[in-house]
Amino acid sequence: MNARTQAIFDARARIIKALAHPTRLFIMDELSRGERCVCELAKMVDADVSTVSKHLTVLRSAGIVSDDKRGLQVFYKLRCPCVLGFLDCVQGVLKANAREHLELAK
């Protein structure tokens, strides 16, 4: 693998790694419905604002979400909604795995 190809796969891995946490997946699901402020998301996940802010920082650093500061509040939205297609694909894999396990259990 040459350096350019390695850099591309490293960048992809960073994005996938940013998604690899249940709380961040939940946040993504909520943001698919529209922008939310950190305080709303904190209530939804039953966590401190600081904890949710750290998760959002990971997602922002990966380029998945963008933020907009309005007064004392920070609102987040999906920067690239196409990432939801990837999450749909993950759900498809889960369904396929469940069917396979059911077949093996017969």
Language model: regions and residue ranges:
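Conserved segment of winged-helix/HTH DNA-binding domains
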Residues: A11, F75-K106
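Beta-hairpin "wing" of winged helix-turn-helix
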Residues: R60-R70, K77
